[in-house]
Structure formats: structure tokens, C-alpha cells
């Protein structure tokens, strides 16, 4: 599904484009892993870079993949467990629903600067964190409504046969830039 944001674009023809600033001083490493063992990974890529001085206080870019499938009870999925200096720049969440219920009331919680008992930021629901509201539901069609903006979106909904159905899958993003 098309995704049109400032940091990442998914365009027709299987074009995946990433515009994150990724400074490096000596070397850079970009790795890809094919987790679909049923298909061979075919890849075309282009990396644009400049050899310039990197300021001493410039932050590095770090990305990681996590999976919890399925969650059980009150188990929380850790989106990012990085500790130390830095700036959290965003989340991409691929989510598949395993039952016929509303799935989005999970609070997004950020624990920063040593906070442990109470989150520094505590959201009200998954759809609110991804800048949607009221179940991402289009009130006229009574279906999920895809949207894509520069900073947040739900660009993909894979529908089996209707609203609130098991095995519906979603692609959501939120950039903090």
C-alpha cells in the first residue's frame, strides 16, 4: 500500500524509499534480512551519501526489528528498549488482529530519563498515537479508513471480510521529527 511520509515512502512498483539522515564517521553498515523463507529476496538499491565532516554532537541512526506474536494477557510489546542519549524518531507497526474485537486500546507508553514507575508519556490508545481516532473508522462506510500524512498514518489495511474481523492486518507509522 502506498505510504507518503517525510521519512519513508512506499510507492507503486515496489519502490521503498528511506530518507532518514544516517551520519557516520568511519563506516556505515546497512543490513537486510529476508524473513519470508518461501520466497527469494530480490533487491534493487541506491545509496546516496556525501563525505563531509560530522559534528561531534551529531547523533547516529539506529533501527531495530522486534516481533511478539501473539501477545498473551497483559504482556506488553516492547517497541524500543534503547538506553542512553538520543532521540526517538519513530515507530512503524505491522499489526495483525487474532480475534473479532477492537484491537487498538493498547496505551503507548514512553519511559524516558530514568522514569521507571510511571511513564513519562502515556497515550490513550493505539489509534490516537498514530494520529487517528475512533477506531480509524470512516463513519459513512463503517470501514477502516486508510490515510497517509508526512508524520503519521495507517496506510495499509488488509481486510478478510469486514470491520472488526480476525486476521485483519494493519500498517501504521508515526514519526517524531
Q: Positions of the model-derived regions?
A:
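Beta-strand-centric surfaces of beta-sandwich/beta-rich domains
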Residues: 1-177
Amino acid at each position: 500500500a502506498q505510504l507518503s511520509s517525510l521519512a519513508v515512502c512506499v510507492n507503486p512498483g515496489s519502490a521503498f524509499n528511506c530518507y532518514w539522515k544516517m551520519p557516520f564517521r568511519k563506516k556505515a553498515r546497512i543490513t537486510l534480512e529476508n524473513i519470508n523463507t518461501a520466497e527469494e529476496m530480490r533487491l534493487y538499491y541506491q545509496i546516496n551519501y556525501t563525505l563531509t565532516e560530522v559534528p561531534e554532537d551529531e547523533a547516529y541512526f539506529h533501527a531495530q526489528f522486534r516481533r511478539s506474536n501473539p501477545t498473551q494477557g497483559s504482556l506488553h510489546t516492547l517497541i524500543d528498549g534503547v538506553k542512553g542519549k538520543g532521540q526517538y524518531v519513530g515507530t512503524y507497526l505491522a499489526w495483525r488482529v487474532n480475534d473479532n474485537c477492537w484491537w487498538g486500546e493498547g496505551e503507548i507508553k514512553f519511559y524516558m530519563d530514568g522514569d521507571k514507575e510511571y511513564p513519562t508519556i502515556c497515550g490513550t490508545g493505539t489509534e490516537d498515537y498514530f494520529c487517528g481516532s475512533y477506531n480509524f473508522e470512516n463513519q459513512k462506510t463503517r470501514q477502516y479508513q486508510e490515510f497517509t500524512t508526512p508524520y503519521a498514518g495507517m496506510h495499509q489495511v488488509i481486510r478478510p471480510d469486514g470491520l472488526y474481523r480476525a486476521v485483519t492486518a494493519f500498517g501504521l507509522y508515526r514519526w517524531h521529527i
